């Protein structure tokens, strides 16, 4: 059996072909979309779980050493892994919210895969993370369809990371490929996510058109300018139809992070001062919520930084605010804060005001956010997205006949207006915002494997 597999920054999804019609496959109970999240007792549990419960072995000596270290660390902590210790999707989020202090929780590991400067052991660990998530999806699909899944087309962004170029992209794709192989896929093909989304839109065209696909996901924004229509449908070689690609690691997560920073971090000390009158360092308020930046997370949650936070607390003019920031450190609450901002962003698409409730276990903080405050907070990210749209048109040397917007963040009226202002007078259409990439990947899988 072959599938299209969208290993997304925010959600994972899979689809099959039923004749000429792609169909999403339920992968989390009756849901077609599973949040790209994982929870475990410890970081080391991921590698050991793959080996003990799924019989997935490391592919090289680096992975073997990682596994040995993981087993030793868990033994020292007295942790014996049982079958439900590793959970995914909504279950992972629920477990984290129940016990943030004693839960290792990861959201959107795809955001880290192209980061430059990773050590071999870090790359091997990310491969284990991705392998665990892919194995879970594969098992869910096989249980649902009662068939083995051996062939897969996996979506990938134009650029995985803002820096690193081809080297970054190759690193990320290699991690995905190795993880998929270890998960049990035999034949693996990659396709650009905006191209896949475009294939789904192309199936509705009755005449040839030049289409600008704008795919705004959780972690990346990708634009592809493509000639599409009846004369291209079903062709395995689309190189002549691809006019331009632009992409950057900015997406819905960045909107949420910026909104968190601008509107939710003041009760934790942002903008406050030490007794000498100097403002608190901005990085202490950015790093805990930069959930798509592995280095920022590592720096904030380091033991050395806890000493720095306690020092700032002693010198603070408003020590009660720094005490809250220390609680963010101790209870790993960065993800929770960003989630609150995400909920506010969604609500403010339809409301002029939203009241956020931050549950810090010891207290509940309530903050009102106005829509214009939200728009101001995401302005810089919005401008970068608009630039990718204009760059694709310039690179392609022609204006599109139509703009097709897709991706989980593309339903935002604010972002749709941004694209319309960049290319006025050109019709803008939307499809299945969450499912277009996945169903397009299934269409490409049929071309590759049927």
Spans of model-derived segments:
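Phosphate/oxyanion-binding active-site loops and adjacent basic polyanion-contact surfaces
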Residues: 105, 125-134, 168, 190-191, ...
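Early-domain small/polar-rich strand-loop-helix modules and first-structured segments
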Residues: 1-118, 251-282
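Extended, hydrophobic alpha-helical segments in both membrane/secreted and soluble proteins
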Residues: 176, 209-224, 405-408, 415, ...
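Nucleotide/phosphate-binding catalytic cleft detector across ATP-hydrolyzing
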Residues: 1-22, 93-213, 234, 320-340, ...
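ATP-binding/phosphotransfer module of carbohydrate and carboxylate kinases, centering on a glycine-rich
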Residues: 384-398, 402, 411-426
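Phosphate-binding glycine-rich/basic clefts of nucleotide- and phosphate-handling proteins
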Residues: 35-41, 61-71, 228-360
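Short glycine-rich phosphate-binding loop at a beta-alpha junction
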Residues: 146-158, 276-278, 392, 396-408
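Conserved phosphate-binding/catalytic loops in two-lobed NTP-binding clefts
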Residues: 183-191, 417-443
